[in-house]
Structure formats: C-alpha cells, structure tokens
C-alpha cells in the first residue's frame, strides 16, 4: 500500500489504513441518524431535505458523455444543497489530523470536496450524503470524543494543552466530559447552538489506544525522523520538486 503513504512505523501504517478505501474502519461507538443531524445543525431531525434544483431525472439536461459515464451521488440525484462537517484534531495523539483526513476523504468518498488548514479540516458534499459520511467519521476510529472536535466555527484548541479530564480546549464548550458517567456528551451542535438534549459520544479512548491509532508523529510517541523510509521518500519528493521547478528540462 505504499502508494498511499511511505514509512514502516505504526503511524505510517495508520495513515495508509485511513487512505485505503479497502481497509474497513473499526467501529468504536454508536450514534443514531437523528443525533448526527443534531450535531450537524443544518436541518431539524425529520425535516425534508431542502433542495437547490429539481431531481436530476426531472431536468432536461443536454447530452454529455461524462454525465453518462459518472453515476451521480444520491444527494445530487435529489437536488440537495451542499453542506459540511468540520473537525479539529488535538496534537496530543488524536486518531486523525487535517492532511490525513483530506487524503482519506478523497480516497474514500465520491462527490465530496475537502479543505485543509493547520488545525481544522472540512468536508463538503450534498446533504444526505454528508449525513452518511459524518456518521461513519463519528462512529469509527477517525474520531475520539476527547481529542477530536466537531467545530463549524471557533475551532481553536488543537495545539493547546489538554484539561484535567484529557479534553481538548474548546472556547464554545461543545463537547463536555460527564464525570458521573465517564462519557463525553455533545451539548451544542457544531456551530455552537445549544441542543435540547445532549448527544452521547461515548467514552474517550485510553492513552494506549490513542498511541496505537494515532496518525501523528511526535517525539514522545513515534518520532518522524525515526521513520527512515518516510523521511527518505519525502526528502526525495522535495528535492525533485525543487529541481524541477528551477530547471524543468
């Protein structure tokens, strides 16, 4: 699977797993479809999907070879609007991180657009398809309720120290650790609007599990420079890219 990511470390293998669409993601928790809708905050549970155009089968589109070749996703067929989910991942051994998320999303999900910044990652697609993708991202090893945050705005906190419960900082306090149950609850949607009832996100992963699943190189975990294969490949790409830019011949 070297085409997905180089390296012989566990971190490198975890990156390959996320980016390989044939790898079956481990399911770690159960979140209902209704709770996913609440977390996203784009429509009310049970509300019809708002549309931006008629269903494709009702549209009189001109003949196009590409349109005939490519099967549209369900939301495009129905005329759904485009919506998003955005994650923030703690630098303290979160399972995923922004660039890995984007690579993985583009390998795994059709009809979706991924955008990456240093501390956040967004995926946009048609609304009903987004809900399916979001459910998978929230229920599987992509997500830890303490070290991963669902944040549509005010995302800061990925590089800050964890609190006494091991939770990543969130200025809007969307995800709260319940000390009575030992579980994390989402009390606001990704935008920061308060929910009528909290959504149970499950127990935080323990430190050993996080260290085993993380895609983040750290000197107090697996150091990047110790993964010789990954370093050599990345240096080769950087050198050839630089040389090609200066002298394409």
Swiss-Prot record:
Chief subcellular location: cytoplasm
Key words of the record: Cytoplasm, Methanogenesis, Transferase
Pfam families linked: MCR_gamma
Assembly mode: MCR is a hexamer of two alpha, two beta, and two gamma chains, forming a dimer of heterotrimers.
EC number(s) stated in the UniProt entry for this protein: 2.8.4.1
Cofactor note: Binds 2 coenzyme F430 non-covalently per MCR complex. Coenzyme F430 is a yellow nickel porphinoid. Methyl-coenzyme-M reductase is activated when the enzyme-bound coenzyme F430 is reduced to the Ni(I) oxidation state.
Protein name, per record: Methyl-coenzyme M reductase I subunit gamma
Molecular functions per Gene Ontology: coenzyme-B sulfoethylthiotransferase activity
UniProt GO cellular component terms: cytoplasm
Source domain of life: Archaea
Family, similarity comment: Belongs to the methyl-coenzyme M reductase gamma subunit family.
Function (record text): Component of the methyl-coenzyme M reductase (MCR) I that catalyzes the reductive cleavage of methyl-coenzyme M (CoM-S-CH3 or 2-(methylthio)ethanesulfonate) using coenzyme B (CoB or 7-mercaptoheptanoylthreonine phosphate) as reductant which results in the production of methane and the mixed heterodisulfide of CoB and CoM (CoM-S-S-CoB). This is the final step in methanogenesis.
NCBIfam families according to UniProt: met_CoM_red_gam (TIGR03259)
Reaction equation(s) it catalyzes: coenzyme B + methyl-coenzyme M = methane + coenzyme M-coenzyme B heterodisulfide
Biological processes, Gene Ontology terms: methanogenesis
Species this protein is from: Methanothermobacter thermautotrophicus (strain ATCC 29096 / DSM 1053 / JCM 10044 / NBRC 100330 / Delta H) (Methanobacterium thermoautotrophicum)
Pathway noted in the entry: One-carbon metabolism; methyl-coenzyme M reduction; methane from methyl-coenzyme M: step 1/1
CDD domains membership: MCR_gamma
Protein's UniProt keywords contain Transferase: yes
Location relative to the cell: Cytoplasm
């Amino acid at each position: 699977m070297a085409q997905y990511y180089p390296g012989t470390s566990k971190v490198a293998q975890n990156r390959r797993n996320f980016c390989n669409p044939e790898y079956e993601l481990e399911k770690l928790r159960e979140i209902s479809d209704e709770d996913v809708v609440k977390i996203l905050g784009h429509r009310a549970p049970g509300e019809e999907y708002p549309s931006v155009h008629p269903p494709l089968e009702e549209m009189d589109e001109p003949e196009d070879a590409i349109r005939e070749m490519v099967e549209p996703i369900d939301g495009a067929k129905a005329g759904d609007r485009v919506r998003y989910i955005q994650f923030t991942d703690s630098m303290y051994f979160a399972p995923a991180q922004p660039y890995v998320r984007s690579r993985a999303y583009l390998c795994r999900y059709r009809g979706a657009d991924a955008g990456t910044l240093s501390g956040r990652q967004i995926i946009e697609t048609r609304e009903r398809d987004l809900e399916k993708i979001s459910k998978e991202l929230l229920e599987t090893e992509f997500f830890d309720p303490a070290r991963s945050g669902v944040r549509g705005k005010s995302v800061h906190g990925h590089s800050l120290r964890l609190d006494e419960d091991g939770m990543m900082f969130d200025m809007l306090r969307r995800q709260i650790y319940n000390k009575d149950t030992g579980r994390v609850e989402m009390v606001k949607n990704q935008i920061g609007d308060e929910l009528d009832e909290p959504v149970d996100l499950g127990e935080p992963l323990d430190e050993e599990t996080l260290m085993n699943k993380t895609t983040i190189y750290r000197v107090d975990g697996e150091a990047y420079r110790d993964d010789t294969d990954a370093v050599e490949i990345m240096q080769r790409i950087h050198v050839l890219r630089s040389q090609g830019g200066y002298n394409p011949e």
